[in-house]
């Protein structure tokens, strides 16, 4: 059994990495849908439902950095290996996005449309910042 454990790990590693790639792609698709919904609501001046949307976005961004283990950059992925080289910056951008989402949620709870729009723009800016550095 002990002889087969390293072989089993070697065989399973790409499968696990592939699963993580799928998880992060699914997570980003969920994030994109939520951002589109939030943008549409803001354009129409509708605040109802935005609190939950930003709560969901915050949860995604808190978890997102865990979906990029070092062995998950081969195969069908658009994630840049720069994430490995600059993990602290990647984590910082994700953390800032979570903070912007939390602040947007508070503004939505307070029916403060102007502040909500500012936090939404900052959240959107974090997307651009991350993609320009860490997406192939």
Label every model-predicted segment.
Residues 123-135:
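The canonical Cys-X-X-Cys-His
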Residues 1-4:
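Positively charged n-region of N-terminal signal peptides that target proteins for export
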Residues 18-120:
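Extracytoplasmic c-type cytochrome modules immediately beyond a signal peptide or single-pass transmembrane anchor
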